[in-house]
Amino acid sequence: MARCFSLVLLLTSIWTTRLLVQGSLRAEELSIQVSCRIMGITLVSKKANQQLNFTEAKEACRLLGLSLAGKDQVETALKASFETCSYGWVGDGFVVISRISPNPKCGKNGVGVLIWKVPVSRQFAAYCYNSSDTWTNSCIPEIITTKDPIFNTQTATQTTEFIVSDSTYSVASPYSTIPAPTTTPPAPASTSIPRRKKLICVTEVFMETSTMSTETEPFVENKAAFKNEAAGFGGVPTALLVLALLFFGAAAGLGFCYVKRYVKAFPFTNKNQQKEMIETKVVKEEKANDSNPNEESKKTDKNPEESKSPSKTTVRCLEAEV
């Protein structure tokens, strides 16, 4: 019971003391001795001769929106040229003075942060700390200037005229005596962007018994050679394009031979005439099959260049810009 009573009495005394301090100390009575805060540290005192005890020092800093500084914070301010000639309370419970140069009247000719341990009831000034300060000296704003590198870029525009001329290419089949038609496209206007051209000519020779396809790819002269031969025509691989052309030529040749050999009158006048033509064609095919083995054995002994069978040649050319 006695312990509870003593605890209540202690709390009541603390609360009463705090009310007395808050009621007796006002912000109008305070004076800031050091107007410029160094590293957030300033010295606060009362305008009257009577100064502050340790409890009043905490309350004075609080009324100004600050907090009671610690000894380490005062030492940091000392390194930034913070110097006073008055002792003041710090949060460690004793008073200190910050001195850069010795002076008999200030700190007894001492240098640095000098400590003086006294009872908390003694009255001194107070060292208050502002945690929101970012400048070394609050009176001298620090302007951070960032110099952006200036690049003097001089762009030299050089225009080179490229005259692309297509040479005349003559493609002929070794199995035909008919020369292929020549292709001479007009030279394009000069431009600053070099262009590459490919001229793909496919010569198709149609014979009665066989079809020969020859492909040539003359390359237009240019300063830069093609580094990747697998690059295709307009995004399509060259091999696929060649195969497509070969299949197309073969189909066209077979169709031509079929029309030339079997179809004599088109369209058919009536169904009876069509049946007669089909029957005649079947009889001719049977005769041709009987005579084919003998003819094939004879053709194998002959050179393809000595063939006297008539042939027709067509040339298809494609020009593409790469």
Swiss-Prot record:
Write down the membrane topology. Single-pass type I membrane protein
Please give the residues the UniProt entry marks as glycosylated.
53, 130
The disulfide bonds in this chain are: 61-128, 85-106
Which parts of the sequence are annotated with region: Disordered?
279-322
Domain Link span(s) in chain numbering = 40-130
Localisation? Cell membrane
Q: What's one GO-annotated cellular component?
A: plasma membrane
Q: Which CDD domains match?
A: Link_domain_CD44_like
- Comp. bias (Basic and acidic residues): 279-309
Q: Which residues lie on this side of the membrane: Extracellular?
A: 20-238
Q: Name one Pfam family in it.
A: Xlink
GO terms (molecular function) for this protein are: cargo receptor activity; hyaluronic acid binding; signaling receptor activity; transmembrane signaling receptor activity
Give me the segments passing through the membrane.
239-259
Function description = Ligand-specific transporter trafficking between intracellular organelles (TGN) and the plasma membrane. Plays a role in autocrine regulation of cell growth mediated by growth regulators containing cell surface retention sequence binding (CRS). May act as a hyaluronan (HA) transporter, either mediating its uptake for catabolism within lymphatic endothelial cells themselves, or its transport into the lumen of afferent lymphatic vessels for subsequent re-uptake and degradation in lymph nodes.
Q: How does it assemble?
A: Homodimer; disulfide-linked. Interacts with PDGFB and IGFBP3. Forms a transient ternary complex with PDGFB and PDGFRB in TGN.
Q: What is this protein called in UniProt? A: Lymphatic vessel endothelial hyaluronic acid receptor 1
